[in-house]
Amino acid sequence: MEVSRKKIYNPNSTESVNERKIFGGNPTSMFDLNKIKYQWADHLWKTMLANTWFAEEVSMNDDKRDYLKLSAEEKIGYDRALAQLIFMDSLQANNLIDNINPFITSPEINLCLVRQAYEEALHSHAYAVMVESISANTEEIYDMWRNDMQLKSKNDYIAQVYMELAKNPTEENILKALFANQILEGIYFYSGFSYFYTLARSGKMLGSAQMIRFIQRDEVTHLILFQNMINALRNERADLFTPQLINEVIEMFKKAVEIEASWGDYITQGKILGLTSSLIEQYIQFLADSRLSKVGIAKVYGVQHPIKWVESFSSFNEQRSNFFEARVSNYAKGSVSFDDF
């Protein structure tokens, strides 16, 4: 069944709080936040606000010097990883505003989506700071999303589910788009993230890694947002979660693992100490299993986390003053984990 975009002005609505729906509701479009149906959305909104940060807070002075000292392979990996992150946050900012939020009919969730779109724009600004501070290949990095055929192939696949929703906004396609967002936020960023942390573990590009830590913390809240929307929909519209749809979702995850593992191998070229092809593949498989289990779908791969040190590098729950000396003061800001929701 085709779903209509919500009205931006709807004074005739008599929808009560308990009648609110993830999509297909009849909201007034007023943000009456004294009445909340999805309490997790209110909690998440406050966490996102507490996590506010700005790219200029992160010093990139040492990174410019470090970049010049990177090996040719390390520079290629840095540029490729950054180019992919730039594309995904650009895509996601537009996707949320133009393609997802218009169909979501819960005001408390609308707020979270608008905040997420702001954060995707903030990430785009952070990447611009990184590119301008470090790389001599500014235009090359910004054009790589369509000029590098390996990257373009990945981007084409990522975008196709969103484009299908824009073309054919059925209930099933909305649900598939929510899963696609979960995959983007929970899988497609992580080869790039782990690459920056691997450099930082060797004492290189510490400012870049700190920027990525802030970005990843935001992405965790985005992942939780879509997982909670999926789980709420499972309660509201169990009829949509057919065996056929679940099988399609599992295939989406399998394809994502294949694409992201291949991308990670392309970034590292088999020449980055600490990130072998097999480690990257197992890491992405582990992430896929984790994401599937969070939305009530059985794990596919049954593998262990192969690079647990990445978690300590990305965590804001520990003061790593010897690693990120410039930003110890920010560790008091909001942190988030799956256990919070």
Swiss-Prot record:
Fe cation 1 binds at residues 89, 120, 123. Its EC number is 1.17.4.1. GO terms for biological process: deoxyribonucleotide biosynthetic process. It comes from the Bacteria. Keywords: Deoxyribonucleotide synthesis, Iron, Metal-binding, Oxidoreductase. It catalyses: a 2'-deoxyribonucleoside 5'-diphosphate + [thioredoxin]-disulfide + H2O = a ribonucleoside 5'-diphosphate + [thioredoxin]-dithiol. InterPro entries: Ferritin-like_SF, RNR-like, RNR_small, RNR_small_AS, RNR_small_fam. One of its GO terms (molecular function) is ribonucleoside-diphosphate reductase activity, thioredoxin disulfide as acceptor. PROSITE patterns: RIBORED_SMALL. The keyword Metal-binding applies. Binds 2 iron ions per subunit. It is an enzyme of class 1 (oxidoreductase). Belongs to the ribonucleoside diphosphate reductase small chain family. NCBIfam families: PRK09614.1-3. This is Ribonucleoside-diphosphate reductase subunit beta. It comes from Helicobacter pylori (strain J99 / ATCC 700824) (Campylobacter pylori J99). The lineage of its organism: Bacteria, Pseudomonadati, Campylobacterota, Epsilonproteobacteria, Campylobacterales. The gene is nrdB.
